[in-house]
């Protein structure tokens, strides 16, 4: 008994004996749960591994892209413009004579002092472009001065009258860069204020790229989007009006992230017509770094200066002619008649008999109305009087406007009736006479209207009908007439000089100029 007690105590101290474990029975549902948990864990680990791999690949791809971009940037830099020996050897007196004759002023914050090109053999371009530009005798003044700076990769502001060869001024360096650097995808964007001007720029660029594989596309409102969206695929150059381009961006049809050559043509016109916010939004979508920006404008008002200072990098400003001072082309004979408002239609018919009689029967005459309804009414008047007239204004479809413009250019119609949509930028050759049936809202528009004649070194005539309704503009008009050495009629003098002569005829003597060398500052409000 005592021995049994001792053995029992010993067993308690030594611990439990090695006895076989009893198996616990696991239910099917528990097995299923365990399996699902295991699969879920494996799936999660697999997903994390995949994400980690993708993240690594993305990082390596970005690094590779940045490296490529650096190489491309240095290649572009090494491709920088080199002045030809023949241009370098020209005497300075010849350069000075060119600058003085063409009233060229250059403001260069980089102090590069690049000489203007006086002939095409002084510039080295891709052979496919040279074949096109060599068809012209010499570069225009804006091309001569702008090309060296643009080919050097600088931002440029060109202040020059319309019809001065601005499309090739920015188009030649743009296409040359695409061909030389072997760029693919969307690289060049040109924004234009009107459908007609956008189409004109597009046609010129198509001619320039006719020997290349560079794809140019034009997008504007007034026509269906479908074909434009289709054409945008694989485009290298896009010419667009601001409204339609914004629509296409919002639709996801175009991505401007690769655009490194941005052109604003007729910048002053776009600001006048309320496109400032659209322009800023479009610029915001383009490439931020290493973007080359160009702005072409016929005038240089404060609004344009401010816009340029916000998104351009120390631009070189090139002015052809006295563009700070609003002035009319001196090759245009300006005639101003003060009449009663109700005499306009009768007077118009008399002027057409005067300017389209005898040997002048087929001379091109451009008539400006102020409003669309007025244009429609006058078009009917002229047709009733057996005149073959074409018309362009906002109530017409894009196809109708294009047909009318082509008809006038080809001489099928010798009369073109237009609202101010045609006053800026359009290249309409050989217009002999401009008739202002109704005076425009500003003298700036007056100067641009009459600038449709007297182009490319030719002379022209501008005949303006002025009424008491516009007398508040009489002083500004007199300044324009005197500045171009044109007679001021006594009837106009009777209205008095409502606008005094100032240091700047359009913007006064006390506007603040903008320093282009300073970057924009961010203002934070607490």
UniProtKB/Swiss-Prot annotation:
Motif range (DEAD box): 265-268
Any single Pfam family the record assigns to this protein: DEAD
Keyword ATP-binding: yes
GO cellular component, one term: nucleolus
BP-aspect Gene Ontology terms: endonucleolytic cleavage in ITS1 upstream of 5.8S rRNA from tricistronic rRNA transcript (SSU-rRNA, 5.8S rRNA, LSU-rRNA)
Biased composition annotated in UniProt, kind: Basic and acidic residues: 1-33
The protein, known as: ATP-dependent RNA helicase DBP3
Organism this protein belongs to: Scheffersomyces stipitis (strain ATCC 58785 / CBS 6054 / NBRC 10063 / NRRL Y-11545)
């Amino acid at each position: 008994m005592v021995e049994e007690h001792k053995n029992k105590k010993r067993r308690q101290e030594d611990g439990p004996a090695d006895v076989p474990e009893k198996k616990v029975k696991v239910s099917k549902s528990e097995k299923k749960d365990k399996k699902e948990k295991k699969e879920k864990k494996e799936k999660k680990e697999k997903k994390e591994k995949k994400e980690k791999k993708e993240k690594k690949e993305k990082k390596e791809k970005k690094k590779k892209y940045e490296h490529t971009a650096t190489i491309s940037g240095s290649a572009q830099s090494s491709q920088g413009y080199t002045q030809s020996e023949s241009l370098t050897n020209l005497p300075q007196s010849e350069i000075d004579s060119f600058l003085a004759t063409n009233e060229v002023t250059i403001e260069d914050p980089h102090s590069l002092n690049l000489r203007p090109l006086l002939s095409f053999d002084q510039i080295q371009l891709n052979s496919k472009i040279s074949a096109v530009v060599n068809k012209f005798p010499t570069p225009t003044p804006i091309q001569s001065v702008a090309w060296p700076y643009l080919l050097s990769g600088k931002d440029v502001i060109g202040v020059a009258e319309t019809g001065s060869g601005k499309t090739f001024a920015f188009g030649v360096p743009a296409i040359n860069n695409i061909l030389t650097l072997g760029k693919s995808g969307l690289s060049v964007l040109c924004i234009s204020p009107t459908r007609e001007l956008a189409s004109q720029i597009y046609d010129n660029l198509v001619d320039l790229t006719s020997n290349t594989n560079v794809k140019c596309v034009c997008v504007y409102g007034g026509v269906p989007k479908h074909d434009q969206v289709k054409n945008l695929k694989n485009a290298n150059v896009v010419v667009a009006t601001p409204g339609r381009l914004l629509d296409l961006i919002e639709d996801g049809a175009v991505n401007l992230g690769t655009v490194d050559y941005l052109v604003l043509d007729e910048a002053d016109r776009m600001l006048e017509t309320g496109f400032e916010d659209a322009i800023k939004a479009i610029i915001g979508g383009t490439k931020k770094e290493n973007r080359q920006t160009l702005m072409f404008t016929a005038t240089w008002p404060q609004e344009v200066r401010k816009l340029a200072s916000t998104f351009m990098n120390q631009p070189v400003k090139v002015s052809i002619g006295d563009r700070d001072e609003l002035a009319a082309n001196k090759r245009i004979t300006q005639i101003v008649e003060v009449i009663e408002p109700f005499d306009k239609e009768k007077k118009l018919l008399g002027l057409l008999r005067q300017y389209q009689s005898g040997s002048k029967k087929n001379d091109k005459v451009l008539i400006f109305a102020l409003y669309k309804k007025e244009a429609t009414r006058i078009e009917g008047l002229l047709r009733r009087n057996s005149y073959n007239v074409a018309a362009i204004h906002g109530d017409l479809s894009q196809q109708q406007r294009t047909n009318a413009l082509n008809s006038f250019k080809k001489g099928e119609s010798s009369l073109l009736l237009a609202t101010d949509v045609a006053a800026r930028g359009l290249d309409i050759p050989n217009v002999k006479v401009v008739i202002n049936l109704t005076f425009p809202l500003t003298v700036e528009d007056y100067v641009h209207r009459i600038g449709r004649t007297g182009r490319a070194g030719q002379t022209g005539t501008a005949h303006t009908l002025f009424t008491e309704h516009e007398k508040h503009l009489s002083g500004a008009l007199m300044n324009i007439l005197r500045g171009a050495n044109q007679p001021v009629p006594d009837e106009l003098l009777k209205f008095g000089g409502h606008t005094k002569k100032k240091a700047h005829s359009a913007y006064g003597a006390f506007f603040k100029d903008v320093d282009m060398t300073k970057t924009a500052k961010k203002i934070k409000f607490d």
